[in-house]
Curated annotation (Swiss-Prot):
Molecular function as annotated in GO: NADH dehydrogenase (ubiquinone) activity; NADH:ubiquinone reductase (non-electrogenic) activity; quinone binding
Protein name: NADH-quinone oxidoreductase subunit A
Subcellular location: Cell inner membrane
Biological source species: Coxiella burnetii (strain RSA 331 / Henzerling II)
Transmembrane segments: 8-28, 63-83, 87-107
Length: 118
């Protein structure tokens, strides 16, 4: 049975070897002459107007986390819908519990004001 996965293992091994070889060759043979211009951020050919490292508002992180959570919900929901006939009532109720937990979490975030942009 493991013989079926051997070509995948060979492919991953060769890919890893090529990636490590390319990185190693670049590190050994590449020039190491950093100067101020090479270490500065690049902004369309102009000198940087201000520091490129600005703090982000926490609300962006909250929206990103909510997006990831509901994106994962979709990733679980589509395969579940495909195999729903085969998994029976246990699979149905397991997904309903999962969706209920997500809905409760969404309502909690909504009530806490995480979605308001004041």
């Amino acid at each position: 049975m493991l013989a079926n996965y051997f070509p995948i293992l060979v492919f991953l091994g060769i890919s890893l070897f090529i990636a490590v070889l390319a990185l190693t060759m670049g590190w050994f043979f590449g020039p190491r002459r950093p100067d101020k211009a090479k270490l500065s951020p690049y902004e369309c050919g102009f000198e940087a107007f201000q520091d490129a490292r600005l703090p982000f508002d926490v609300r962006f992180y909250l929206v990103a986390i909510l997006f990831i959570i509901f994106d994962l919900e979709t990733a679980f929901l589509f395969p579940w819908a495909v195999v729903l006939r085969h998994i029976g009532w246990f699979g149905f109720w397991a997904m309903m519990v999962f969706l209920a937990i997500l809905v409760v979490g969404f309502i909690y975030e909504w009530k806490r004001g995480a979605l308001e942009w004041e």
